[in-house]
Amino acid sequence: MTRAIGIDIGGTGIKGAIIDLDAGELVSDRIKHATPDGGEPEAIIATVAQLVDELGLKGIDHIGVCFPAVVRNGRTMSAANVSKRWIGLDADTLFGTALGRDIHFVNDADAAGYAEAVSGAARGQRGLVIMTTLGTGIGSALINDGVLIANSELGHLKLDGRDAETWAANSAREREGLSFEQWAERLTTYYRYVEALLWPELFVIGGGVSKQHAQFLHLIDVRTPMVPAALRNNAGIMGAAALAVRHAR
């Protein structure tokens, strides 16, 4: 049995659990703490250390952490909804020193997409799978034949001279009071553009609004099959843990 801890750091909450990677499931309670005000590195590291202590490290060699940032070789290159002091930080080393284990940092959308490819809605799918998370912005993950292509930022594709996410994310629907039908027209424009660039085999749609997929998914007019995410709130945790073990190998 291969076990690892997955940690999902967000702007408002930090959650984690122990994952059985062979079974593709949580084998502990999912523990959640509030993200410290300001999202400073030291405070977040302390909160993660507390969470890991509550989960327990017995039999655990690897910890994966997903984070709302572009991550290159364990270094956070951007910061969304957390302190800008994260930019350029060697997160792998800082967290590894604090927790006494090998740490692997990844982008949060990448972690969620990888989990869906390994254990969720895209399990067994060959070719290119694109997961998008529709929320405040549009997060994205590209997985080709099971291999993650890290740090895609498809929410920043330009449509009519502006970032697509400012016009097509779920936050735009809520802000402008769009019906699901009106929003689906925008999503059709967005996903057709992505299709023209990348020709994926499957789109997986995540984010909190994916719980309401029956109200809008069938209205998006694209040629690529489109399915809702299956793992929901556990996707980041599971993907971070799986990528930590894969990275170690």
Model-derived segments and spans:
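ATP-binding/phosphotransfer module of carbohydrate and carboxylate kinases, centering on a glycine-rich
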Residues: 1-62, 71-75, 93-100, 115-130, ...
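Histidine-centered metal-chelating micro-motifs
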Residues: 139
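General beta-strand structural signal in soluble alpha/beta enzymes
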Residues: 103-108
